[in-house]
Curated annotation (Swiss-Prot):
Record-level GO BP terms: isopentenyl diphosphate biosynthetic process, methylerythritol 4-phosphate pathway; terpenoid biosynthetic process
Cofactor list: a divalent metal cation
PROSITE patterns reported for this sequence: ISPF
Binding residues annotated for 4-CDP-2-C-methyl-D-erythritol 2-phosphate, in chain numbering: 9-11, 37-38, 59-61, 64-68, 135-138, 145
UniProt xrefs under CDD domains: MECDP_synthase
Protein known as: 2-C-methyl-D-erythritol 2,4-cyclodiphosphate synthase
Cofactor note: Binds 1 divalent metal cation per subunit.
Keyword Lyase: yes
PANTHER family found in the cross-reference section: 2-C-METHYL-D-ERYTHRITOL 2,4-CYCLODIPHOSPHATE SYNTHASE, CHLOROPLASTIC
Catalytic activity: 4-CDP-2-C-methyl-D-erythritol 2-phosphate = 2-C-methyl-D-erythritol 2,4-cyclic diphosphate + CMP
Pfam families, alphabetized: YgbB
Pathway where it operates: Isoprenoid biosynthesis; isopentenyl diphosphate biosynthesis via DXP pathway; isopentenyl diphosphate from 1-deoxy-D-xylulose 5-phosphate: step 4/6
Organismal lineage: Bacteria, Pseudomonadati, Spirochaetota, Spirochaetia, Leptospirales
Keywords: Isoprene biosynthesis, Lyase, Metal-binding
Record gene name: ispF
Length: 161
C-alpha cells in the first residue's frame, strides 16, 4: 500500500542578522531570517506536514502548537524526527520527496546541494529520491514583494510488508 502526502508552509521574511536562516536543516549565510515560533524551517515543516497528511494524523500544529511557550525557537529537526517516528509506528517507509521553495530571495540554487544532502541524512533517503526545486512568483503578491517565502512538498510512503 502506498500513501501520498502534501505539505505546505509559509513564513514571513525579514532582514535580521541576529537570527539564522534555516532551510532544510542547514544554516544559510544570509541577511534574511524567517519569522516564526520555531526556527521557521519551511522545508522541514512542509515535509513534516506531508508525512502527517499521508498518515491521516493531522498537522504539525497539533503536535507542536505555537501557543506552547516551551516550544519557542524549537529546532525543526525535532519536529521532523517526531513525524518520522509516527511514520515508523504505522509501519511506513519514505520512498521519495519533492519540495518546491517559492520566493524571490534568498536564491535557493546555490544552497540546493547542501539542502539535499542534509535532507538525505535526516530522512535516511538516497540523494536520487530527494528533489529540491525553487521558483518565484514573478514579483507578484506578498512573496513577490519579498515579504515571505514558502515551500510545497509531496511525499510517497510505502507500507512495510
Amino acid at each position: 500500500m502506498y500513501r501520498i502526502g502534501n505539505g505546505i508552509d509559509f513564513h514571513k521574511l525579514e532582514i535580521n542578522l541576529n537570527r539564522p536562516l534555516i532551510l532544510g536543516g542547514i544554516e544559510c549565510e544570509s541577511e534574511f531570517a524567517l519569522v516564526g515560533h520555531s526556527d521557521a524551517d519551511i522545508i522541514l515543516h512542509a515535509i513534516s506536514d506531508a508525512i502527517l497528511g499521508a498518515l491521516a494524523l493531522g498537522d504539525i500544529g497539533q503536535y507542536f502548537p505555537d501557543t506552547d511557550p516551551s516550544l519557542k525557537n524549537i529546532d525543526s529537526k525535532i519536529i521532523l524526527v517526531k513525524c518520522l517516528e509516527l511514520m515508523k509506528e504505522k509501519n511506513f517507509d519514505l520512498v521519495n520527496i519533492d519540495c518546491t521553495v517559492i520566493g524571490e530571495r534568498p536564491k535557493i540554487t546555490p544552497l540546493k546541494d547542501r539542502i539535499t544532502k542534509s535532507l538525505s541524512n535526516l530522512l535516511n533517503l538516497p540523494l536520487d529520491c530527494i528533489s529540491v526545486k525553487a521558483t518565484t512568483t514573478e514579483k507578484m503578491g506578498a512573496l513577490g514583494r519579498q515579504e515571505g517565502i514558502g515551500t510545497f512538498c509531496s511525499i510517497l510512503l510505502e507500507k512495510r510488508s
